UniProtKB/Swiss-Prot annotation:
Binding site for ATP: 620
UniProt motif ('KMSKS' region) ranges: 617-621
Domain of life assignment: Bacteria
Protein name per UniProt: Leucine--tRNA ligase
Subcellular location: Cytoplasm
Record-linked PROSITE patterns: AA_TRNA_LIGASE_I
Family: Belongs to the class-I aminoacyl-tRNA synthetase family.
Length: 856
């Protein structure tokens, strides 16, 4: 074998060889247990970043491990290829989105292949390909026919730069678009929605079926679904037959209601507004109308409101209370109205103080007898109901039930469960997305495109002049079609689908990616699903993961799959962070090449100013990124993989460190030299097991300890970093061992390479073949622990006198307490320190030490 480790040569060689062998193809007919390993597929931006590399390397190690452990493995890859960036690139560069996207996919695929990922590329999918989005459209129609897809007029978040609708999740807490950075506006449009709310309770309760998910992610979904148990109460409007309906989780406070608040958009707002207040109310509505929901409900923003002049009546006590409108009440949430209980709600208390509204105490602490205490803040804890008519003296927690029963009896309201989750708005006014397969007919209304006419393809003769209206809305030849039902002139839907639709089912397509007759074969999908290990970023905790769970349940109810949940286990890998330099005076980031270390400080090379330094997520704007191509070019894929796996536990953030990269490169070189030395000095005959020396047994123990520790590290939480540490320990044990003529040494070399194979697949394969094997190392079996090899024949016994260590001796691991004391006394150390001494007490800790207490 070559004396020097040449990563570039062996990696290229084996990547080509694995393709020829078809090593990464998914076994179709096998009796082996299945394992489906999947990384969240990328958007084809054109270049891999280190976050990508970490994600895909983690999944690849798991896939390779499971193959070695005897599983048939599905490990596919594809492209989340629709979306605004491609369309914006077409505008900026003057090239079609498809051309830009497919070029990027090709480029990124080559980059992924250089990492040595064991991906079955024959199952590659691209969501922008007609053969994929045909089935996205078909699945949409399944939901439409089931009543889960519908259109309605809705106030939406409008991005004025990208000229499209944004879901609430795509607007930040300051009211800006997550992608373009534009200030989001409110706009009334007819939009398509999916009834995810029909599955709210299932989505919530089935989180208990996911023990393999991080608690943090489950909590985020639980909060987003936002189940509230309470009551629906109605407040009559004075002088009207109308009533204001509110939802409350605190019916026990209803006697403390001193005002009600409507959303500015509420249909009753204009009806309750008096002529005197109309001008002010109209101005307020106009002011609020351009603010996003996120902006209006932000907790740190002052709440604004105005009196309408109207009055409501609290049916429980007959009191007249003012009606206001306020920005923090949203018509799309709940009933679009809330009751104000300032004495027992923090937000209401602050709002009432600002508006000089009455504050009425109806709950007091159990140990208090003051029924009208002065308040400096809202009292929100449980207590005793007061000033509440027939409910005075009742525990407030019991009062909730009592009030609801009374309301139902008197016709004031009823018990109700409400969810924060809203239906999923899927319309997008853009070109580069999956067309919604419906036609609007003046006679027939909305008509589904027949299955035989799918896919509704995106037209190619599109002119991109700027980010104004959707290009599809201008294409008369494409829009105008006969109605599929009556044959009369009709128009296509010009909105496209939210790209999260594409990614809500892609994992199912992988199970049968080349099927031209159906989205996926039911038998194949049910065979491979659910995904055994899913890997991706925490940023997808709510959107993608929740939508995919909804899709799976909806398709289950259509008889298309037989599972409740798509992802058994979820690993959310941490970010890759780079060393970042920043001028604290100007706030500007400084590239590393402009930084010098001088007088114990990092300084700007040009100005000499002291810079602050820290680790942050890699990005171009912070000049702290590391190009994977440069790392692979200098060290090779195996070194990059080893560093990423060793530097931090997978769920933690990883701080990039060139010195540690170099350290992993040195380790692989040591492994190379270790095998080269073994082959150079390999004996012609091997000792029999019965002839094993103590050194042989110690080495075998080190080998099987490594198998045990690494196997345990790679189950459960996938602690790759500690597994790599164990690989290093085994390598060191083999380097230090002198028993090359022993069969144990050969076992150690082979075991090291198989254990290394999932982490550094190229060097492991090369060295395996150098040992003389023809069959790929990746087709071997994961080593199993021999319990007998872990048994320790001898241990090191510490001898202490008065608690101080005086020496050690080797003793049998099975020696009794009496035998240990005897051996310690008879040892050279014992005789030297105990001769002529009066031993008062002997403390024996089996397997560790003997401590002699002597008289002073």
């Amino acid at each position: 074998m070559e004396s020097q480790y040449n990563a570039a040569a062996i990696e290229q060689k084996w990547q080509q060889d694995w393709v020829k062998q078809g090593l990464d193809k998914t076994p179709e007919n096998s009796n082996k247990p299945k394992f489906y390993a999947l990384s969240m597929f990328p958007y084809p931006s054109g270049n891999l970043h280190m976050g990508h590399v970490r994600n895909y390397v983690i999944t690849d190690v798991i896939a390779r491990l499971k193959r070695l452990q005897g599983y048939r493995v599905l490990h596919p890859m594809g492209w989340d290829a629709f979306g605004l960036p491609a369309e914006n690139a077409a505008i900026d560069r003057g090239i079609p989105p498809a051309e830009w996207t497919y070029k990027n996919m090709s480029q990124m695929k080559q980059q992924l292949q250089t990492l040595g990922l064991s991906i079955d590329w024959e199952r590659e999918v691209a969501t922008c390909a007609p053969e994929y989005y045909k089935w996205t459209q078909w699945l949409f129609l399944q939901l439409y026919q089931a009543g889960l897809a519908y259109q309605k007029e809705a106030a939406v978040n409008w991005d004025p730069i990208d000229q499209t609708v944004l879901a609430n999740e795509q607007v930040d807490s300051e009211g800006y678009s997550w992608r373009s950075g534009a200030k989001v506006e409110r706009k009334l449009l007819r939009q398509w929605f999916l009834k995810i709310t029909d599955y709210a309770e299932q989505l919530l309760t089935d989180l208990d079926k996911l023990p393999g998910w991080p608690d943090r992610v489950k909590l985020m979904q639980e909060n987003w679904i936002g189940k509230s148990v309470g009551a629906y109460l109605e407040f009559p409007i004075k002088g009207s037959e109308e009533k204001i309906a509110v939802f409350t989780t605190r019916p026990d406070t209803v006697y403390g209601v001193t005002y009600v608040v409507l959303a500015p958009e509420h249909p009753l707002t204009l009806k309750v507004t008096t002529p005197e207040q109309k001008a002010a109310v109209d101005a307020f509505i106009e002011e609020v109308s351009n603010e996003s929901e996120i902006e209006r409900t932000a907790e740190d923003k002052p709440k604004r409101g105005i009196l309408t002049g109207g009055t409501a009546i609290n049916p429980f006590n007959g009191q007249e209370i003012p009606i206001l409108i306020a920005d923090y009440v949203l018509y799309e949430y709940g009933t679009g109205a809330v009751m104000g209980v300032p004495a027992h709600d923090t937000r209401d208390f602050k709002f009432a103080k600002e508006k000089q509204l009455p504050i009425k105490v109806v709950i007091i602490p159990e140990n208090s007898d003051n029924t009208n205490p002065p308040l400096t803040e809202a009292y929100t804890d449980p207590g005793i109901m007061v000033n509440s008519g027939i409910f005075d003296g009742i525990q407030s927690t019991e009062g909730k039930t009592a009030i609801i029963e009374y309301a139902e009896k008197e016709g004031y309201g009823k018990a109700r469960i409400q969810y924060r989750l809203r239906d999923w708005l899927i319309s997008r006014q853009r070109y580069w997305g999956c067309p919604i397969p419906v036609v609007h007919c003046p006679s027939c209304g909305t008509v589904a495109v027949p299955d035989a006419d799918l896919p509704v393809k995106l037209p190619e003769n599109v002119e991109f002049t700027g980010r104004d209206a959707s290009p599809l809305a201008k294409l008369e030849d494409w829009i105008n079609v006969p109605c599929p039902s009556c044959g009369e002139p009709a128009k296509r839907e010009t909105d496209t689908m939210d790209t999260f639709i594409d990614s809500s089912w892609y994992y199912l397509r992988y199970t049968d990616a080349n099927n031209n007759q159906e989205a996926f074969n039911l038998e194949k999908a049910n065979d491979w699903m659910a995904i055994d290990q899913y890997v991706g970023g925490i940023e997808h905790a709510i959107l993608h993961l929740l939508y995919s769970r909804f899709f799976t349940k909806a398709l289950r109810d259509r008889g298309l799959v037989n599972i409740d949940e798509p992802f058994k286990r979820l690993l959310t890998q941490g970010m890759v962070q780079g060393l970042t330099y920043k001028n604290p005076q100007t706030g500007k980031y400084v590239p590393s090449e402009n930084v010098i270390f001088q007088d114990d400080h990092y300084r700007d090379k040009e100005t000499g100013e002291i810079l602050s330094f820290f680790y942050e997520k890699m990005s171009k704007s912070k000049y702290n990124g590391v190009d994977p191509k440069q790392v692979l070019g200098k060290y090779g894929a195996d070194t990059a993989r080893m560093f990423i796996l060793f530097k931090a536990p997978p769920e933690k953030d990883l701080e990039w460190d060139d010195a540690d990269v170099e350290g992993q490169f040195r380790f692989l070189n040591r492994v190379w030299r270790l095998v080269a030395n073994y082959l150079e000095n390999k004996p012609k005959t091997v000792k029999k097991a019965s002839e094993l020396t103590k050194e042989d047994k110690d080495l075998r123990r080190a080998i099987h300890t490594a198998i045990k520790e690494i196997s345990e590290d790679l189950e459960g939480d996938y602690q790759f970093n500690t597994a790599v540490s164990e690989l290093m320990k085994l390598s060191n044990a083999l380097t230090d061992a002198k028993c090359l003529e022993s069969g144990v040494y050969q076992e150690g070399i082979e075991t090291l390479l198989i254990l290394l194979a999932p982490f550094a697949p190229h060097i492991a394969e090369e060295l395996w073949h150098n040992l003389g094997y023809e069959k790929s190392i990746h087709l071997q079996s994961w080593p199993t622990v021999n319990p007998d090899a872990l048994v320790v024949d001898e241990i090191t016994l510490v001898i202490q006198i008065m608690g101080k260590t005086r020496g050690t001796i080797q003793v049998s691991a099975t020696a009794t307490k009496d035998e240990l004391e005897k051996l310690a006394r008879e040892s050279e150390v014992g005789q030297r320190y105990l001769d002529g001494q009066d031993v008062k007490k002997v403390i024996v800790v089996p397997g560790k030490l003997v401590n002699f207490v002597i008289a002073k």
